[in-house]
Amino acid sequence: MGEIDVFFLDEPTNHLDLPTLEWLEKFLAKFQGSQLIVSHDRFFLDRICTHILEIHDGHTRGYAGNYTAYLQQKELFLQTLADRIDKCEKEINRLTGALQSMKRANNYDKSISQKHQMLSRSQRELKWLKKLKPKERRGLQFNLQSTEKSSLDVLDFKHATLKFEGLNRPILNKVEIGVRRGQKIGIVGANGAGNTTLLRIINKEIQLDDGVIDVRPGVEIGYFHQDHRTLDFDLTPVEQVQKLKPRMDYGDIRAMLGQFQFTKEMVSTPLKKLSGGERARIAMLKLLLEENNMLLLDEPTNHLDTDAKEALEETLQNYDGCIMTVSHDRWFLDQVCDTIWELPGDGTIVVHPGNYSDYLRRKGKA
């Protein structure tokens, strides 16, 4: 590596488990050369990058610092820009009013030429400022509400044991652990530790070898599969919604799909011809239309752009039901989760109160 001066990295964290992500970050932090990185992994950008280059509407803008610093500077820039636009518009209105008053009074003194020049200058400035303002994208709108609340105890693992044939270690080994109403749990561990398997056990897709999972009455589970297997890929987005809600008015369906950024052409395109991100939005919409008070989310931010991730995070923060999520998106885990379940790979589950950053601090990895 001593001969390499620069790395060009295109989505380097895709498909990596958390231990490998941590190794990559340590390696890149020690690398003495330059790095040009394209990534949607906000946590990774926060830990590695010293400058952020934003591309928006065909324009680029640079920000010094990591991803958090970029967010802060961008917010300040947009607020300052909005203030300058407002001030400029008020000055144009003032000058226009003054010129109109002078015209009505037939009072053409020496200042009229100066005022015309000031008005022209302010109009040019306003035009320039508005060019700096990013075009507002139609935001993705989630509206997630739980059904009637479940009991305080949502579910319990009792002596839960599972081992796969050919694997020399258990996935679960006599696990005793519970989930409470309103908890938002992030499940982390190396690939193969059983993260997704845990969700599938709760969803009764996989049976335990021993023990039970006691799901309390009134618990309604919604499951987001990372491969979107609950969708019918031969259907269009409209047909997928009609299948779930046959009595919903067509106009309401179109309006709802519009809120999820589906155009007129896209709503009549079979899902198999849509992108991964577009299918992910349909899978999330399907989940929102179902009546549930517990969500099992398997890599819910895969294929979503940053705006969609932020919309999803805000929605899940306000969701009053229970959430259990498997995700390699550490920024997402920070924003949504209040508890981390760590699967070390020995059949146990270690509970860490707090979000992912709290978990790292306890592990001495922050």
Describe every region a protein language model picked out.
Residues 76-170:
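Flexible nucleotide-interacting loop at or near the entrance of a catalytic core
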Residues 1-85, 149-366:
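ABC ATP-binding cassette signature C-motif
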